[in-house]
Amino acid sequence: MFPLVEFCISNMAKGSDVVFEKLENDPNIDVLEYGCLQNCGLCASSLYALVDGDIVEGNTPDDLLKNIYQHIEDNDITNLL
């Protein structure tokens, strides 16, 4: 089972789409896009994604991508690394 990373389409329009596309090309991660993840305050203030249900944030797309991989590693989420 691979880590699941979920994105809000509104947040993707603010820049997390770059991260979505990079993760979509990683065969060891499952990614999903939703219309809304019900985190509107967070969505308005930063880039974020849900990683196996946990909120992971970043100030830039590169920060978000780095933080997602770090969260996966720190939490030993399956066989990614």
From Swiss-Prot:
One Pfam family linked to the record: DUF1450
InterPro entries: DUF1450, UPF0349
Domain of life: Bacteria
Membrane-spanning residues: none
Similarity annotation: Belongs to the UPF0349 family.
Annotated HAMAP family: UPF0349
Protein name: UPF0349 protein SERP0525
Species per Swiss-Prot/TrEMBL record: Staphylococcus epidermidis (strain ATCC 35984 / DSM 28319 / BCRC 17069 / CCUG 31568 / BM 3577 / RP62A)
